[in-house]
Amino acid sequence: MIEVLAFPTPNSVKVPIALEEMELDYRLVPVNLRQGEQKTDAFKAMNPNAKVPVLIDRSVPGDGDVVLSEPAAILVYLAEKTGQLLPKNGPHRGKVFEQLVFHASGLSPAFLQAFLVANQSSPQPEAQARAIGG
């Protein structure tokens, strides 16, 4: 059985989407970031960075549980496990990795920054006026 520890974030939703596309059975385990559940010792034993998502694959015979914590690594692991969604070689495989890296290093940090500015900073009317050309 595959378990996905997650919270409704752009990074977390990538994993269940892939699992659904691959038609793999999994169990979604909610981790409440607002209550700090990702900062517990038990969670940090799975991911010392205290971030979601975390994937636990208990279906690997003889190897014990596979525990992964970075969305791109999880997606590549699932693709290679199933032989789906990732070309075996060639330029199309490169394009998939290009998108994975873009999401990990460009898009996800930008979403986080926008969220923090919108939800955790005080209003700055002068900056807002400059941004809209006022």
Q: Where would I find each of the regions flagged by the language model?
A:
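GST-like domain detector, emphasizing the conserved glutathione-binding G-site
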Residues: 1-130
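Aromatic-anchored helix/helix-loop segment that forms the rim or "lid"
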Residues: 133-134
